[in-house]
Amino acid sequence: MTSVTVGLEVYEITRSTFMVSLVGVISLVPMILAGLYGGMLADAFDRRTVALVSAVMAWVSTAMIAAHAWLGLDSVVLLYVLVTVNAVAGTVIGASRAAIVPRLVGNDLLPAASALNSISAGFSVTVGPAVGGVLVAAFGFAPTYTVDVVLFSAAFLGVVTLPRMAPEHDALRPGLSSLVEGARFLRRSRNITMTFVLDIIAMTFGQPRVLFPAIGALVVGGGSITVGALSAAYAVGALLSGVFSGPLGHVRRQGEAVGWAITVYGGAIAAFGVVVAAAHLLGGRASETFSTGILPALALCALALAVAGGADNVSSVFRGTILQAAAPDGMRGRLQGIFIVVVTGGPRVGDLYAGLVVAAGFAWPPLIGGVLIIALVALLLRLVPSFRRYDALHPNAN
């Protein structure tokens, strides 16, 4: 909810899609450092403690964003800082929590665990953006942030009830030696590296969220309601694919499945780009008031984004399973740190890509990006045949 609301608030203050894109871009470098260091912390210390401390940090930053809105400061710089702190904390939480999962379940249950996690995440991001858009339209930014602060408090329960997760073996203390050890392992592990590279491609060229405020204000119309609907459509697709993910546990060629899922994702993003470009060429609808006249374009955009969300979730389930099954426990924290950096940092690079393309005068970044995704995935799967042949029954990092 907060991520959507911050984007709307920055757009309200600046009326600039590029400034909205900077919400994610500015936090990218700190988040990369946090992911790397947080992963080392998860390998060296009790993973439950690392997750709990990070959750407190994330809650405090969310509360400060709400305070900023209540005080009416309208400071884009302060919003950038607070969102960066929140992203840093979230990266460390993700690294430590994901490294915990293989210690709780066996390899045969990892796809099911990943799918269950995707259902939980999908539900939160489905309800969050939709409710966020409606609350902003009805009550404004401050009450919307406050609701998120209250809901975020419930997240502590899941972390507190986890068992202690001390390292199974002696681990290097966080520092350069630990980082180098993880980097060397990753360099030798082509299959794990491919999960990162493919996701970077998908998120860099296929992340249209930074365009949503402008689409709602200038192209499709509908303002914050449209932004919430588009954000929710993506999440609904992810949620539904998680709910019906039972057959994924029987897929052995998981690397090949990742390739197909990301290819479908690229096609869906390209279709979304076609609808947006067509609406733009037809003159757009410069209105932030929701009306039935925008429903055809909004429905087509939402359908494409729902397919994209579903495909992205399937890809995420398999990529996460490959990483957790093929990596030794002593490396999982560091590799999960890199994984979280990729899955959260990639969209921020995608925000910059979309913002720059629009700033250059083009309205078609999703269309161009979707085609690039399809082409690059096909090329990489041909260049790395071991990834296509990856067998879930015989996990192999190489």
Could you describe each region identified by the protein language model?
Residues 1-398:
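Alpha-helical transmembrane-bundle signature of multi-pass membrane transport and export proteins
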